[in-house]
Amino acid sequence: RELAELTIGFYRRNYIEGLFLSSGVLRSPDYTTERMIECLRILREEYRFNGYIHAKAIPGTSPELVQRLGLLADRLSVNIELPSQKGLQTLAPDKSKQAILRPMAQIRDRARESKAELVKSHHAPVFAPAGQSTQLIVGATADNDRHILHLTQSLYEKYRLKRVFYSAYVPVVENSLLPSKDTKPPLLREHRLYQADWLLRFYGF
């Protein structure tokens, strides 16, 4: 409720136009998502918040909770973070490819169904009308740009993503599995990936 009150206060003062809601995992994906849903419910139903909401769907969350989240948010995102299964196994062994792709497929299918339902009835509930997106970290692993762009194209085609965002890895700790702390963030590489992404989305390269 505190976050909902803070958001509506800023919104009414025209400080913000929307909310991006994300969270680390507290206790479990379902418990965390339930708290996110309650925050959005208060905003939408009690405060009549009509601003834009982008919510993060946490891998491992039950389909029922992803459904409820999508009915309250304009856009959902399931962040892949690391662009290969090898990278996930090395740096995030608690995550799996299937746990990430499963909610992506659900969001894709449910958004398609929602559009079809709206054709039949304008009063049908709307599910994530602004679609879904994801984020990839660039430079934390040895994955090259060819691999990243192949993955990006596959995500656009198979999961109907609206955007893939790229984030240059910034070293903050010394770890033998990661680039050293004196490694500069690959900002130019990030920029070039955004340029290539533009060509994929708008020109079909």
What are these regions (language model features)?
Residues K97-L101, D145, L149, E190-L193:
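Amphipathic alpha-helical transducer elements in NTP-driven molecular machines
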Residues A111, K115, Y159, D197-G204:
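Alpha-helix capping/termination and helix-coil
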Residues G51, A130-Q132, Y159-K162, A196-W198:
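Structural beta-strand/beta-sheet cores of well-ordered domains, especially the beta-sheet scaffolds
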Residues E174-F205:
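Long, highly charged, low-complexity intrinsically disordered interaction regions
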Residues R1-T134, G139-A142, L155, V170-D182:
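Conserved Radical SAM active-site core
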Residues D145-Y169, E174:
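Long, internal scaffold/assembly segments composed of regular secondary structure
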